[in-house]
Amino acid sequence: MEQFRNVGIIGRLGSTRVLETVRRLKRFLIDRHLHVILEDTIADVLPGHGLQTSSRKMLGEVCDLVIVVGGDGSMLGAARALARHKVPVLGINRGSLGFLTDIRPDELELKVAQVLEGQYLTENRFLLEAEVRRQGEAIGQGDALNDVVLHPGKSTRMIEFELYIDGQFVCSQKADGLIVATPTGSTAYALSAGGPIMHPKLDAIVVVPMYPHTLSSRPIVVDGNSELKVVVSPDMTIYPQVSCDGQNHFTCAPGDTLHVAKKAQKLRLIHPLDHNYYEVCRTKLGWGSRLGGHD
């Protein structure tokens, strides 16, 4: 197991609970004689912290562990910035669901200490890279840990598009949009649109139409190495939006093509040893508990 000596902290802004947890975490790490580096945005709201600061991008270069304090949205943003550096990332939940940030604030010291002592699990989560092309030229690019979504933006009209997978025509469709999700993102927007839950170790991508104008349209699970192309109908009069993790956005024009494929670099996600994916699903999604009388 790796020994962590340079630990970066990223915190969600605008939350007093996050600031309180960041302060606790900072003190705990300093007491263990670790070199602590704060992301510059959270450092700005912690006057007198007395620590080295860094941009989020640079944290990946100077740290051998980054701890994210916030919710899943905070982890999504951190993942896109840090995946290329292969730095392990650990999450402390100060959001609502916490699929990715799985350490509770009340167990911060215990669980972080275990991780620092080498008692942890590592998961490699792949990201998607999206590119919009206009007449063959790239006009917008973005990465996503959860999903790439084609949607009508502020318009209430349906989108007409064609879907190709690995160069093969799949279908033409009218729908409110299309979600292309990783296994990580299968419990997010894709789930609410009727997609399946995929275990994060699966090397697969799910394609989920949003309110399609045909009853036979269903989600498709494809190989994780597939290359997807979505052609926006040239006859459309609206300009659809592409969103990566609901955080990065760019605009398509009629006739543009959206290309989505697996990104080469993966997120190294750290969990405590007692992490259980099915327990997370059961807790976060409200699944039924075990029947009495069974071992």
UniProtKB/Swiss-Prot annotation:
Its EC number is 2.7.1.23. One of its GO terms (biological process) is NADP biosynthetic process. InterPro entries: ATP-NAD_kinase_N, ATP-NAD_kinase_PpnK-typ_C, NAD/diacylglycerol_kinase_sf, NADK. Keywords: ATP-binding, Cytoplasm, Kinase, NAD, NADP, Nucleotide-binding, Transferase. NCBIfam families: PRK01231.1. PANTHER family: NAD KINASE (PTHR20275:SF0). This is NAD kinase. It comes from Ectopseudomonas mendocina (strain ymp) (Pseudomonas mendocina).
